[in-house]
Amino acid sequence: MLGIWTLLPLVLTSVARLSSKSVNAQVTDINSKGLELRKTVTTVETQNLEGLHHDGQFCHKPCPPGERKARDCTVNGDEPDCVPCQEGKEYTDKAHFSSKCRRCRLCDEGHGLEVEINCTRTQNTKCRCKPNFFCNSTVCEHCDPCTKCEHGIIKECTLTSNTKCKEEGSRSNLGWLCLLLLPIPLIVWVKRKEVQKTCRKHRKENQGSHESPTLNPETVAINLSDVDLSKYITTIAGVMTLSQVKGFVRKNGVNEAKIDEIKNDNVQDTAEQKVQLLRNWHQLHGKKEAYDTLIKDLKKANLCTLAEKIQTIILKDITSDSENSNFRNEIQSLV
């Protein structure tokens, strides 16, 4: 009886060990099967998602040509909601994942283009050159007008090449052109003489009507070539009309935008407009030869009386300054 009680603990320990090994074996087997199942599922999912686009949480198939994506799919591998592009204005020419269609190309008539094939939902517009236009590049953004031949055509203009013209008779035409241009220098010379004659006439009249003698304008122009006109701008503006001032500054570098700006800044004051216009011209021109430019331009415009009036004003002022300076020097020498 004592022997049985001694063996009983050994028997129970052996049974417990056998049970534990059996359970562990079963768990290991289950884990192994679970891992194989996950690998299988992953392989299947990977195969199913090939060629799909990942957007957000899910992958989806592309929209076909002529359509765009309107809403994402809610399940992996599903098709998104696609809607057609606007006919005649938009297109897509291949399967894609975008939510936008492409704009159809415009054939600009101003660049010599016209429509060859209209835009559809699956194809862009195709342009070509208009009649009498050509384009010799691979991608034509604009077409050039065909050359018009005056002396005959060697090869007609095509969509991809310009006209080839004959050159016969070009020398004789050049001769005629020279004959036509030959009188131009003579006309210019005659016109200049007429202006000079008119100015001399005005000069004689002015000399006869004024008691005080005036200098020869040609001599004045030479002596006063570098006079600083900035101190005389207001006086000069006072003897010129607004139209005369505008005409002068336009010919001598002041652009229309600046003329309009000065006009708008002094709408109610034409006198100030003239002053500002002349000042702007003087700043652009600079001090050197500004006097010569003003006088010569007025004479060319047949405004000899005005030119001589400005000469007289400036000359009197300079003469007065010179006399005052001499007088001061004499006083200082006496002291």
UniProtKB/Swiss-Prot annotation:
Residues 1-25 form the signal peptide. Residues 230-254 are annotated as: Interaction with CALM. Gene3D superfamilies: Death Domain, Fas, Tumor Necrosis Factor Receptor, subunit A, domain 2. Disulfide bonds join C59-C73, C63-C82, C85-C101, C104-C119, C107-C127, C129-C143, C146-C157, C149-C165. Changing Q283K: Loss of interaction with FADD. PROSITE patterns: DEATH_DOMAIN, TNFR_NGFR_1, TNFR_NGFR_2. Changing I313D: Constitutive activation. Promotes apoptosis, both in the presence and in the absence of stimulation by a ligand. The chain crosses the membrane at residues 174-190. Residues 230-314 form the Death domain. Glycans are attached at T28, N118, N136, R250. Isoform 1 and isoform 6 are expressed at equal levels in resting peripheral blood mononuclear cells. After activation there is an increase in isoform 1 and decrease in the levels of isoform 6. Residues 212-317 are annotated as: Interaction with HIPK3. GO terms for cellular component: CD95 death-inducing signaling complex; cell surface; cytosol; death-inducing signaling complex; external side of plasma membrane; extracellular exosome; membrane raft; nuclear body. (Microbial infection) Glycosylated at Arg-250 by enteropathogenic E.coli protein NleB1: arginine GlcNAcylation prevents homotypic/heterotypic death domain interactions. Palmitoylated. Palmitoylation by ZDHHC7 prevents the lysosomal degradation of FAS regulating its expression at the plasma membrane. Changing E272K: In ALPS1A; also found in non-Hodgkin lymphoma; somatic mutation; loss of interaction with FADD. The keyword ATP-binding does not apply. Residues 26-173 are extracellular. The keyword Transcription does not apply. Changing N255D: In squamous cell carcinoma; burn-scar related; somatic mutation. Receptor for TNFSF6/FASLG. The adapter molecule FADD recruits caspase CASP8 to the activated receptor. The resulting death-inducing signaling complex (DISC) performs CASP8 proteolytic activation which initiates the subsequent cascade of caspases (aspartate-specific cysteine proteases) mediating apoptosis. FAS-mediated apoptosis may have a role in the induction of peripheral tolerance, in the antigen-stimulated suicide of mature T-cells, or both. The secreted isoforms 2 to 6 block apoptosis (in vitro). It is linked to Autoimmune lymphoproliferative syndrome 1A: A disorder of apoptosis that manifests in early childhood and results in the accumulation of autoreactive lymphocytes. It is characterized by non-malignant lymphadenopathy with hepatosplenomegaly, and autoimmune hemolytic anemia, thrombocytopenia and neutropenia. This is Tumor necrosis factor receptor superfamily member 6.
